[in-house]
């Protein structure tokens, strides 16, 4: 399962950089775990070059060849079984079970769906595999004759799966009578901090968007013993905030310079992030933390981003090979829609009752101020599996 976690985390960084190309000055927030899971479901129904391209984008082969580049023809022509399908399926099954464990001290509601035009019926074997390994039942729907009704039904299902937090995933023009297959992924997350902020300490303070512009935010504050790590190139500081039971952590990566976010984003690699956030790099400090309250709800039509990353054949009617999914030819992926919701406040990711405890340490710790009053990167990690569930940047209140 370690190789799957590595693939998901590598995808997180590559995908964030792709989104950043067309989102200058904008917030970014997505779930690499959610997108990887939904694309893996599609991958298992593809063959040939279509499968090889998806494997490339999802980083399934990267651990076998650290020198591969997106343009590598060798990778494009890789056989579907370059990494055993059984391994991918069972790894996802294990990871899904770990992350969605009902004993976890957080709520993670995921809506994963594959919707295919009913004149392109799914293979029974594919339907069985999706239910067994992913807990998902692909749906045959009537895009051809009732696209609007189908869109509303999909949106209603997503809304119910995410406890009403994610609405209208598919916009008005998302599907039409020519739509053949749509992939949807929406995630709602709710967690409680191990150490909660006191609302009495929250004040309106300026958030410096750049050296010349600032906006007021509600800035939370607390002084606690927290894990901190230092980044030398580029100059930045990182901090780990545990959620209750320490199943999950929020990591903040704050550039030293107000305008240093772009440089930090470009510098982040899987290897560097693993090094920075390793236990060896963490030091316990008495931290005076200032963190803005914020709510992010970002929607993405992933077709263009995924195509430009190398996964183009799946969206091309004349090239797509979904023979592992349906007996009908000409089936192709019309669109991929993803939406994630997060709210960072005094209690955690959504207001809820809860108490935090603190370990009492008699040794005197060095003091440090962590003032997130300018653009920063953040991600939420599932600690047992080391998987990045959510990744984002906050630069525009």
Curated annotation (Swiss-Prot):
Keyword set includes Cytoplasm: yes
PROSITE patterns listed in its UniProt record: SERPIN
Keyword field contains Iron: no
Location(s) in or outside the cell: Nucleus; Cytoplasm
Site feature (Reactive bond) residues: 362-363
Any single GO CC term annotated in Swiss-Prot or TrEMBL for this entry: extracellular space
Alphabetical list of CDD domains matching this protein: serpinB10_bomapin (cd19569)
Keywords, ordered alphabetically: Cytoplasm, Nucleus, Protease inhibitor, Serine protease inhibitor
Pfam families, per the entry: Serpin (PF00079)
One Gene Ontology term of the molecular function aspect: serine-type endopeptidase inhibitor activity
Motif Nuclear localization signal: where in chain: 74-77
Family membership noted in the UniProt record: Belongs to the serpin family. Ov-serpin subfamily.
Function per UniProt: Protease inhibitor that may play a role in the regulation of protease activities during hematopoiesis and apoptosis induced by TNF. May regulate protease activities in the cytoplasm and in the nucleus.
Protein name: Serpin B10
Gene name of the record: SERPINB10
């Amino acid at each position: 399962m370690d190789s799957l976690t590595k693939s998901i985390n590598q995808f997180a960084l590559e995908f964030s950089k792709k989104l950043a190309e067309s989102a200058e000055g904008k917030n970014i927030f997505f779930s690499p775990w959610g997108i990887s899971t939904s694309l893996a479901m599609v991958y298992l129904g593809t063959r040939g070059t279509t499968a090889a391209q998806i494997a490339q984008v999802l980083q399934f082969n990267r651990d076998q060849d650290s020198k591969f580049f997106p343009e590598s023809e060798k990778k494009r022509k890789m056989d579907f079984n370059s990494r055993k399908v059984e391994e991918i399926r069972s790894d996802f099954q294990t990871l899904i079970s770990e992350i969605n464990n009902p004993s976890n001290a957080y709520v993670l509601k995921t809506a994963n769906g594959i919707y295919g035009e009913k004149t392109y019926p799914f293979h029974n074997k594919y339907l069985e595999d999706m239910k067994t390994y992913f807990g998902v039942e692909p749906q045959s729907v009537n895009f051809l004759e009732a696209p609007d009704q189908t869109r509303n039904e999909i949106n209603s299902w997503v809304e119910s799966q995410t406890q009403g937090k994610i609405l209208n995933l598919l916009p008005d023009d998302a599907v039409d009578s020519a739509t053949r297959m749509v992939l949807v992924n929406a995630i709602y997350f709710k967690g409680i901090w191990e150490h909660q902020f006191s609302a009495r300490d929250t004040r309106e303070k300026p958030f410096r968007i750049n050296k010349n512009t600032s906006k007021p935010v509600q800035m939370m504050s607390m002084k606690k013993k927290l894990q901190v790590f230092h980044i030398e190139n580029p100059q930045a500081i990182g901090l780990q905030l545990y959620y209750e039971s320490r199943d999950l952590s929020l990591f903040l990566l704050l550039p030293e310079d107000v305008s240093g976010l772009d440089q930090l984003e470009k510098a982040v690699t899987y290897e560097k992030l693993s090094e920075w956030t390793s236990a060896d790099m963490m030091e316990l400090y008495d931290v005076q933390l200032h963190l803005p309250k914020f709510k992010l709800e970002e929607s993405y039509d992933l077709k263009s981003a995924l195509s430009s990353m190398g996964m183009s054949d799946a969206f091309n009617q004349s090239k797509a090979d979904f023979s592992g999914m349906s007996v009908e030819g000409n089936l192709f992926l019309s669109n991929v829609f993803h939406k994630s919701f997060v709210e960072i406040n005094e209690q955690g990711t959504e207001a809820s009752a809860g108490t935090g405890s603190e370990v009492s340490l008699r040794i005197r710790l060095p003091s440090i101020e962590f003032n997130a009053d300018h653009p920063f990167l953040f991600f939420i990690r599932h600690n047992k599996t080391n998987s990045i569930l959510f990744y984002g940047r906050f630069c525009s209140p």
